[in-house]
Amino acid sequence: MKGFFAGVVAAATLAVASAGDYCGQWDWAKSTNYIVYNNLWNKNAAASGSQCTGVDKISGSTIAWHTSYTWTGGAATEVKSYSNAALVFSKKQIKNIKSIPTKMKYSYSHSSGTFVADVSYDLFTSSTASGSNEYEIMIWLAAYGGAGPISSTGKAIATVTIGSNSFKLYKGPNGSTTVFSFVATKTITNFSADLQKFLSYLTKNQGLPSSQYLITLEAGTEPFVGTNAKMTVSSFSAAVN
């Protein structure tokens, strides 16, 4: 993957805004606990546009970052990117995970006009620690402008309350990967939860094998279309215990 190291070290507090935003399709910045990706994986689905991402601050296990973009024209129903902060962690089988505490506080702004995006966690599992994606578990904190998840039927298969938040659960395929999407029934901009509870629900009720390894944990935004849009994550933290 093309990218750069943004001079982030394991200091108690370190501001890296001076490192500047990065705008390349696969650019990223790494700290001890996180990798922050620009990840413009589907930019060619837009008629025009660009996106840049930057890290603002690191304090212990908490990171602050932002991403700004304009995506116009083309396939308005397709995601263009997934700028995100990915946790660096040791892969574990779901049955051996005790907790996945996480917090995320963010704000979103955009110019007038059509704006479609989601804010979501994205978890992937596999039957081996080094295997390819078999299950994808998304947790949508926000669905702006009519954004919708992958679904075989277009309808939720369940309504689930986890912690103090209610979610509609959708299921569908993405190639050979089975995708579960928990979509919050109302926008959450200040989120605190144990993500293990989402995995536990799926293993008990939706057939997710507890022998699967959690191999990826990310949180970010999927834009479909928008002008002068910016997501600012004032704080994000996560751990797999």
UniProtKB/Swiss-Prot annotation:
The active site is at residues 136, 222. The keyword Signal applies. Keywords: Carbohydrate metabolism, Glycoprotein, Glycosidase, Hydrolase, Polysaccharide degradation, Secreted, Signal, Virulence. Its EC number is 3.2.1.151. It is found in: Secreted; Host. Induction: Expression is strongly induced within 30 minutes of infection of soybean and then slowly declines. GO terms for biological process: polysaccharide catabolic process; symbiont-mediated disruption of host cell wall. It is an enzyme of class 3 (hydrolase). The keyword Secreted applies. Gene3D superfamilies: 2.60.120.180. Glycans are attached at residues 174, 190. Its main location: secreted. It comes from the Eukaryota. The xyloglucanase activity is inhibited by the binding of the host apoplastic glucanase inhibitor GIP1. Residues 1-19 form the signal peptide. One of its GO terms (cellular component) is host cellular component. It catalyses: xyloglucan + H2O = xyloglucan oligosaccharides. PANTHER family: BLR1656 PROTEIN, XYLOGLUCAN-SPECIFIC ENDO-BETA-1,4-GLUCANASE A. Interacts with host apoplastic glucanase inhibitor GIP1. Glycoside hydrolase that exhibits xyloglucanase activity. Acts as an important virulence factor during P.sojae infection but also acts as a pathogen-associated molecular pattern (PAMP) in soybean and solanaceous species, where it can trigger defense responses including cell death. XEG1-induced cell death can be suppressed by P.sojae RxLR effectors. The PAMP activity is independent of its xyloglucanase activity. XEG1 induces plant defense responses in a RLP kinase Serk3/Bak1-dependent manner in Nicotiana benthamiana. Belongs to the glycosyl hydrolase 12 (cellulase H) family. This is Xyloglucan-specific endo-beta-1,4-glucanase 1. The gene is XEG1.
